[in-house]
Amino acid sequence: MEEQQRARSHTVTTTTSSFAENFSTTSSSFAYDREFLRTPPGLLIVAEIVLGLLVWTLIAGTEYFRVPAFGWVMFVAVFYWVLTVFFLIVYITLTYTRIPQVPWTTVGLCFNGSAFVLYFSAAIVDASSVSPEKEGHNFNSWAASSFFAFLVTICYAGNTYFSFIAWRSRTAQ
């Protein structure tokens, strides 16, 4: 009987790595930049999030799948809305200062430039697909989404400008 109990017992050894210790100390200090929301790029990002949310919710609340062009508009609106929320979190929490390997000014310029171009194409597709004859009861939602899509495009154009200024000043050094 004692032999069976000895066979069942085993020794557990635990070790800690320096990575785990470093991780716990760095995650306890949480930085927050509330002044970012008062800068022009910060205000534009908030406007992009609010207006972008309006674009895709106004379309999602309709039978948009009957008009294939709205699939493109939905893809662009949701994709860039999620990424813009991600970038807002990165900027507010100062995560970009903890990851210096990433060229954040170049990433911001590429992101905002691509968002401007693709949102502009989506806004044109959105506006050209709005017709009271196709789906009369969806007309108002689609027309409003088209209007807000152009406003989001203007916001991304403004952020592209500010990103370009930051990128140019960074590369000139």
UniProtKB/Swiss-Prot annotation:
Where, subcellularly, is it found?
Answer: Membrane
Q: Organism's domain of life?
A: Eukaryota
Enumerate the Gene Ontology biological process terms.
chemotaxis
Give the main localization category.
Answer: membrane
> Which regions span the lipid bilayer?
41-61, 70-90, 105-125, 147-167
GO CC terms in record = extracellular space; membrane; nucleoplasm
Domain MARVEL intervals: 36-168
> Listed GO molecular functions?
cytokine activity
Which topology term describes how it sits in the membrane? Multi-pass membrane protein
Q: What is this protein called?
A: CKLF-like MARVEL transmembrane domain-containing protein 8
What is the species listed in this Swiss-Prot or TrEMBL entry?
Answer: Mus musculus
Gene name, Swiss-Prot/TrEMBL: Cmtm8
